[in-house]
Amino acid sequence: MAHVIYDNFYLSNEVEDQFNSHLNLQTFCTVDNSLVGTAGMKRRINVYQATNGTEKLAMGEGNTKSIEVSYAEKEYEVLLAQNKFEYFDEQAMTDSMLVPVGTRHMGTDMFNHVNADIFAEFKKASLSHPTAVFDFAAFVDAQALMNLENLEGVSIFGFVCPADMAKIRKALKDDLKYVEAFAKAGYVGTVGGVNLYTKKDATAGEIIIATRDAVTLFNKKGTEIEQPPRSADDANIRKNTIISRKYYLAALTDATKAVKITLTA
């Protein structure tokens, strides 16, 4: 195994940042821990969506269309995410950081993997609002597409890449407010009722705003950790294996609660 190790001798241990994004998307979706079954099993889910209905009108004109809500049954497959870490006794004895860093990255890698699938579902949002600039009006107009009757108690959030966040700060200035109640990793500020979070792997020129109802993570609770007993062959060469696995599926279950704000210029 090609681990890069060192003789632990008067060296400080620096661990590289290996998270694709520190933003835990499980806190931004509905988590359903009732998932049962095994990898490859099918699950049918009703996915709700709505058509756009906002129009710019002149005096005396009225809307020619209205927002329509519908649902479609979609079939999802239960996923199994698994990784393994292998090392030899001699490697662990030579470098005391090998096993802690390796096992920690098992969790990091699993986190990145599940996060990517959740974000992929947010990116399926069918409602969109094009804008020439990420200004106050853009966030208010995009929020209106969700057609929420009562905003009380509803938390709307937005995922923004770092480059676009700089543009937003310049465009919004005093309209970007910092609300202590929403402070968590990545939180930058709130505009027009939308809490903005920096996500370093978000797409440039595209901001996704949503509520927790948009995406559901169906989760078989807990991550399984297995360290199988060594076979005779592995024992002979002093080889160890640790395995972690997780069963889950992420689904855009309510497309009426997610909107893409896309930059046109």
Residues of each region from the PLM?
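Alpha-helical scaffold segments that mediate packing/assembly in large oligomeric complexes
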Residues: 82, 86-153, 260-265
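Extended oligomerization regions of viral-like shell subunits
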Residues: 140, 144-224, 236
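Short helix/loop capping segments that flank catalytic or ligand/cofactor-binding pockets
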Residues: 53-56, 167-170, 251-253
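Short glycine/proline-enriched loop/turn "hinge" motifs that connect secondary-structure elements
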Residues: 70-79
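Extended, compositionally biased alpha-helical segments that mediate assembly or anchoring
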Residues: 230-265
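N-terminal "assembly arms/tails" that initiate or stabilize quaternary assembly
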Residues: 1-71
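Structural beta-strand/beta-sheet cores of well-ordered domains, especially the beta-sheet scaffolds
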Residues: 41-43, 83, 154-156, 192-194, ...
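Short, ordered beta-strand-loop transition motifs
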Residues: 36-39, 199-204, 230-238
